[in-house]
Amino acid sequence: MVGFGANRRAGRLPSLVLVVLLVVIVVLAFNYWSISSRHVLLQEEVAELQGQVQRTEVARGRLEKRNSGLLLLVDTHKKQIDQKEADYGRLSSRLQAREGLGKRCEDDKVKLQNNISYQMADIHHLKEQLAELRQEFLRQEDQLQDYRKNNTYLVKRLEYESFQCGQQIKELRAQHEENIKKLADQFLQEQKQEAHKIQSNDGKELDINDQVVPKNIPKVAENVADKNEEPSSNHIPHGKEQIKRGGDAGMPGIEENDLAKVDDLPPALRKPPISVSQHESHQTISHIPTGQPLSPNMPPDSHVNHNGNPGTSKQNPSSPLQRLIPGSNLDSEPRIQTDILKQATKDRVSDFHKLKQSRFFDENESPVDPQHGSKLADYNGDDGNVGEYEADKQAELAYNEEEDGDGGEEDVQDDEERELQMDPADYGKQHFNDVL
């Protein structure tokens, strides 16, 4: 300002400058007013924006919280979805298994239907078989009743025939003992005659007696053998012929075809009684030595050995025939007398042969075993060219028969004892037809 007002006076301002200053002040005031108003507006906007920011922050916090909750929900939903998928997989596998079971059940159903049809056919067939079996059962019941009737009939017939056999056995025994008595009387008479002849003859006639007595010894042996063979050889065949002549043993109404039904009898009736020949042989073969009387307590059927010691009695087993035969235990006194006579005959024959043997060995000087005196040396006619009497030979043969087999009785007894040791059923099959 100093430059402009150099040629002016001091203290004085120009009007232009003043106007300009005024204009500048006005402009500045207007600017200040506009700026202040604008500043106020901006502050209001800032306050509004701060309020909006606060609201957005609150909304943001709420949104974040909501977002976190939604994320949790999403996680839970994901877990549920995974679980559902796993459950779906399990259910699908179960469904497949059920479908497989359903198919198998269908197959089993078809098989069961087929089996039911087969079983129905089998049931029908079994019903038919049951009806047939019932008919067969009824038929067999009828047969059983017929068999029972036949059994009772056969039992009665067996009892009757066994009674008839018992009667015939009693008759045959009586005949047999009468024959034994006759033979015993005849033998005693012959023995008395021989004793009388021996006593009447002198010692000078020994040579004649050597020829006569051995001729009588075979007769005695033959009589004893005939007496012993009669109960075994002639006793039972005669009974058989009598039974076979009658055919049905006094029952004409019985057919011969009924004999084939004997195998159908029960085992108790199948065992036939012991044959009569066995019973007679056991009664007649019992030997009693001389010089020893029977004790009163000893039964008549007890056997006595050759040494004089009583042996064990051989008893026949009990049988239905023996129980049915009345009076089977007959008196055995004639039989005991016959045995005593037989033993006496044997003793006399043995004494005679001992005497004859001593004389024979004195003449020929042939040794004899002293331990086996009963067995003579074998005959050999070329030793020393010494002739022998025919009567001596026959006496030796008769003596050997007496010592070896007792006239064949011991062999028969051994055969019968072997038969007794057999099974009674086998024995019955062999001898049942003989008894009938």
Curated annotation (Swiss-Prot):
As given in the record, the signal peptide range reads none
Say yes or no: keyword RNA-binding present.
Answer: no
Spell out which residues are annotated as carrying N-acetylmethionine: M1
UniProt feature, compositional bias: Acidic residues:
399-418
Q: Where is the composition biased (Polar residues)?
A: 275-295, 305-321
Locate the Phosphoserine modifications and list their residues: S233, S275, S328, S332, S366
What parts of the sequence cross the membrane? 15-35
What InterPro entries would the database entry show?
Answer: GOLM1/CASC4
**Residues in compartment: Cytoplasmic:** 1-14
Where can this protein be found? Membrane
Membrane topology qualifier: Single-pass type II membrane protein
Q: Which ranges sit in the Lumenal compartment?
A: 36-436
Q: Where is the composition biased (Basic and acidic residues)?
A: 193-207, 224-247, 344-362, 426-436
Instruction: Give the coiled coil ranges.
Output: 35-195
Spans annotated as Disordered: 193-436
Q: Name one GO cellular component term.
A: membrane
Give the UniProt keywords, A-Z: Acetylation, Coiled coil, Membrane, Phosphoprotein, Signal-anchor, Transmembrane, Transmembrane helix
For this chain, the family text in UniProt reads:
Belongs to the GOLM family.
Cited PANTHER family: GOLGI PHOSPHOPROTEIN 2/GP73-RELATED, PROTEIN GOLM2
Task: Spell out the protein name for this chain.
Answer: Protein GOLM2
Species whose genome carries this gene = Pongo abelii (Sumatran orangutan)
Q: What is the lineage of its organism?
A: Eukaryota, Metazoa, Chordata, Craniata, Vertebrata
